[in-house]
C-alpha cells in the first residue's frame, strides 16, 4: 500500500477541498462518512450502469461494491455513483430504440459531469449493455484522468432440447413462426429459456465486441472482457480494477497515454478477426474523436483487407462468447495475432505494462479447440466488416458480411420510412427474393437516435431469405444481425443524402468485391427528385430533439460535440 504522504500527493483534483475556505464542502463530505484521515486520500469514483430492467446490468450494483473494496485496499477513498442504461434487446422494435444510441452520449456526459463536479482523481466505470462501454470510454477520453473500464461479463447460453440458444434465437424464432416453421408454443419455449441469468448478450454481439475492443485498446484489465458474468474470475477482476486504477494514479498514467493510433488499429484488427458488430465502427470513431486520434471510416477497410475472420462465433457461427473464454479468451486470440505480426506489442496499457508484457501471463489457445480457426484456414480470408461507397452512400456505409456467400446483389428497392412499415411488409409476405428492403429517415438525426433493425433483419433470416433479400438503412443493426445487410448509410436521409430520394423499383447494387453501393439513376432524375421531394422537419422535443440538432453523421461516429472549424476558431 502507498503511504499517506504519497497518497496525499495523488490528490491531483480533490486537493481543492483542502483550504480553510472549503470547510463547508468538507462538512458535506463528512456526512458521507469521510473522517480527517480520509481527506488525505485520493477520491476514486466507482460508476455503474446498474438497472433492474435488463439482465445485462442487473448485477452491476453489487459489482460496484466489489470495485470499492479494491479501491479501499489500495488506500484511496471510493465513492459510488450511478448512471443510466437503455437495453437494446428490450427497446428493440419499439419507439424506445431511439434512445439507445442517444444513451451512449448521455452516459458519457453524465460520467463527466459527476466526476468533474465532484473533483474525482480517478474512476472505475462498470458497464454491461451495448452503449455502456463506449459511453464510459468517451468520458474517460474527454476527462483524461486515470480510469479503467470493467465489463459486467457475458451471459451464459440458454439451453433447449440439449442445444445452446440465446436472445437472437428468439428474434429469429418469430420469423420462423411467421413463415409457418414454428408454433407459438415453440417460440414461447425459446423465450423462456434463452436468457438464464445476468450478463451481456452472449454472441459476438455489440456488448462483447465493445468489451473486447476496450480490453484491446488497453483500458480494461487483460483477460477481463472474456470472463462470464457469473464466474469467480469476473468478481476478481472487478475488485482488481479498483486496485489497478489507484496504481494508474501512482504511475501518472492517463487515457491519453493509452489511446494511441496504434491502439485503435489493434482494436479494429481484433474486431475483424472475431467478427464483431457493425456498431464497433460507430463507437471506435466516437472514442477516437474524444481522444483526439485521427481515425476515419475508410481506415476500417485497410484492416478489413488484411485481417482474416477467424472466430466461429454467433451470430454467423456456432459458438457463444463463453465458449471463447473456455479456450483461452481474448488474450489467447491476441497472443495468436501478435505472434503472427498483426498487433502492436509495444504500446502501453492500463497495467503500466505493454501489450506483449501483459500477454506473457496467459496461455495460448487450447490445442484442438474449434472456436478460433487457424490463419491457414480462416472462416473468411478477409474481415467481415466492409465500408461501402457509391452514389447511394457518398460518405460511406457499413456492411457485415460474415457468413454471407453472396458477393454481389442487384435488385429492386422496396422503400419504407420506418421499421414498422417494413416489418408489416415482411409479415404480409410482400417481400420477395431479390428485393432490396430500404428503411430510411432512421439515421442519427432522422430517427432520431439511429435505431437498430434486429427485429426486421431476424424476421427476414427466420423466413429463409437471409441471403436472398438485402436490407439497407441509414439506421443501425444489432450486433446480433447477420444476412445481407448494409447500415450507417451517409449522408442520412434527414440530411438530404441520396437515400432520401431512392424510390421503390429503383435498381440497387451491393458489391462486396468493389465495395460499391449504387442505385441506377441519371443525374437529371436525381436533381428532379431533390427539387420536388420535401424532407421532414427535425424532431424538436426533449432529449431526442436536442440530439437531432447536434449529432454528427454516422460517418463521423454520431458524436454530439463535433464542431466545424468556423464555430471554434480551430482548424
From Swiss-Prot:
One of its GO terms (molecular function) is dihydroxy-acid dehydratase activity. Transmembrane segments: none annotated. Its EC number is 4.2.1.9. GO terms for biological process: isoleucine biosynthetic process; L-valine biosynthetic process. It catalyses: (2R)-2,3-dihydroxy-3-methylbutanoate = 3-methyl-2-oxobutanoate + H2O; (2R,3R)-2,3-dihydroxy-3-methylpentanoate = (S)-3-methyl-2-oxopentanoate + H2O. Binds 1 [2Fe-2S] cluster per subunit. This cluster acts as a Lewis acid cofactor. Keywords: 2Fe-2S, Amino-acid biosynthesis, Branched-chain amino acid biosynthesis, Iron, Iron-sulfur, Lyase, Magnesium, Metal-binding. NCBIfam families: ilvD (TIGR00110), PRK00911.1 (NF002068). Functions in the biosynthesis of branched-chain amino acids. Catalyzes the dehydration of (2R,3R)-2,3-dihydroxy-3-methylpentanoate (2,3-dihydroxy-3-methylvalerate) into 2-oxo-3-methylpentanoate (2-oxo-3-methylvalerate) and of (2R)-2,3-dihydroxy-3-methylbutanoate (2,3-dihydroxyisovalerate) into 2-oxo-3-methylbutanoate (2-oxoisovalerate), the penultimate precursor to L-isoleucine and L-valine, respectively. HAMAP family: IlvD. This is Dihydroxy-acid dehydratase. It comes from Streptococcus mutans serotype c (strain ATCC 700610 / UA159).
Amino acid at each position: 500500500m502507498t503511504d499517506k504522504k504519497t497518497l496525499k500527493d495523488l490528490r491531483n483534483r480533490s486537493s481543492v477541498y483542502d483550504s480553510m475556505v472549503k470547510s463547508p464542502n468538507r462538512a458535506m463530505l463528512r456526512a458521507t462518512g469521510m473522517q480527517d484521515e480520509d481527506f488525505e486520500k485520493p477520491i476514486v469514483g466507482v460508476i455503474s450502469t446498474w438497472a433492474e430492467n435488463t439482465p445485462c446490468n442487473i448485477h452491476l450494483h453489487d459489482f460496484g461494491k466489489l470495485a470499492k473494496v479494491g479501491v479501499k485496499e489500495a488506500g484511496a477513498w471510493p465513492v459510488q455513483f450511478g448512471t443510466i442504461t437503455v437495453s437494446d434487446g428490450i427497446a428493440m422494435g419499439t419507439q424506445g430504440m431511439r434512445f439507445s444510441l442517444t444513451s451512449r452520449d448521455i452516459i458519457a456526459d453524465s460520467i463527466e459531469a459527476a466526476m468533474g463536479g465532484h473533483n474525482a482523481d480517478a474512476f472505475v466505470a462498470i458497464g454491461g449493455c451495448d452503449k455502456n462501454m463506449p459511453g464510459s470510454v468517451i468520458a474517460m477520453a474527454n476527462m483524461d484522468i486515470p480510469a479503467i473500464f470493467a465489463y459486467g461479463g457475458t451471459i451464459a447460453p440458454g439451453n433447449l432440447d440439449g442445444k445452446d440458444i440465446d436472445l437472437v434465437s428468439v428474434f429469429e424464432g418469430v420469423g420462423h413462426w411467421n413463415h409457418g416453421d414454428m408454433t407459438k408454443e415453440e417460440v414461447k419455449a425459446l423465450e423462456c429459456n434463452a436468457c438464464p441469468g445476468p450478463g451481456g448478450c452472449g454472441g459476438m454481439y455489440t456488448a462483447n465486441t465493445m468489451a473486447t475492443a476496450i480490453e484491446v485498446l488497453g483500458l480494461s484489465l487483460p483477460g477481463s472482457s472474456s470472463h462470464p458474468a457469473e464466474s469467480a474470475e469476473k468478481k476478481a477482476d472487478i475488485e482488481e480494477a479498483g486496485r489497478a486504477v489507484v496504481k494508474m494514479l501512482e504511475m501518472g498514467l492517463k487515457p491519453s497515454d493509452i489511446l494511441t493510433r496504434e491502439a485503435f488499429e489493434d482494436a479494429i484488427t481484433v474486431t475483424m478477426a472475431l467478427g464483431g458488430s457493425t456498431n464497433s465502427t460507430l463507437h471506435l470513431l466516437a472514442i477516437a474523436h474524444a481522444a483526439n486520434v485521427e481515425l476515419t471510416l475508410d481506415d476500417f477497410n485497410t484492416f478489413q483487407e488484411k485481417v482474416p475472420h477467424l472466430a466461429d462465433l454467433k451470430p454467423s457461427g456456432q459458438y457463444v462468447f463463453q465458449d471463447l473464454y473456455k479456450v483461452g479468451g481474448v488474450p489467447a486470440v491476441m497472443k495468436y495475432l501478435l505472434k503472427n505480426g498483426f498487433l502492436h506489442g509495444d504500446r502501453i496499457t492500463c497495467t503500466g505494462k505493454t501489450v506483449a508484457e501483459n500477454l506473457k501471463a496467459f496461455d495460448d489457445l487450447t490445442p484442438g479447440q474449434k472456436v478460433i480457426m487457424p490463419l491457414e484456414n480462416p472462416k473468411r480470408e478477409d474481415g467481415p466488416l466492409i465500408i461501402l461507397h457509391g452514389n447511394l452512400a457518398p460518405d460511406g456505409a457499413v456492411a457485415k458480411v460474415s457468413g454471407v456467400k453472396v458477393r454481389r446483389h442487384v435488385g429492386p428497392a422496396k422503400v419504407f420510412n420506418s421499421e414498422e412499415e417494413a416489418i408489416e411488409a415482411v409479415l404480409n409476405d410482400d417481400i420477395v427474393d431479390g428485393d432490396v428492403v430500404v428503411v430510411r429517415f432512421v439515421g442519427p438525426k432522422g430517427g432520431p437516435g439511429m435505431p437498430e433493425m434486429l427485429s426486421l433483419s431476424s424476421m427476414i433470416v427466420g423466413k429463409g431469405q437471409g441471403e436472398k433479400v438485402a436490407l439497407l438503412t441509414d439506421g443501425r443493426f444489432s450486433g446480433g444481425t447477420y444476412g445481407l445487410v448494409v447500415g450507417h448509410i451517409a449522408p442520412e436521409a434527414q440530411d438530404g443524402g441520396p437515400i432520401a430520394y431512392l424510390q421503390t423499383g429503383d435498381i440497387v447494387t451491393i458489391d462486396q468485391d468493389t465495395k460499391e453501393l449504387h442505385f441506377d439513376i441519371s443525374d437529371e432524375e436525381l436533381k428532379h427528385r431533390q427539387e420536388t421531394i420535401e424532407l421532414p422537419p427535425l424532431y424538436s422535443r426533449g432529449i431526442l430533439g436536442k440530439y437531432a440538432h447536434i449529432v454528427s453523421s454516422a460517418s463521423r461516429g454520431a458524436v454530439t460535440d463535433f464542431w466545424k472549424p468556423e464555430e471554434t476558431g480551430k482548424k
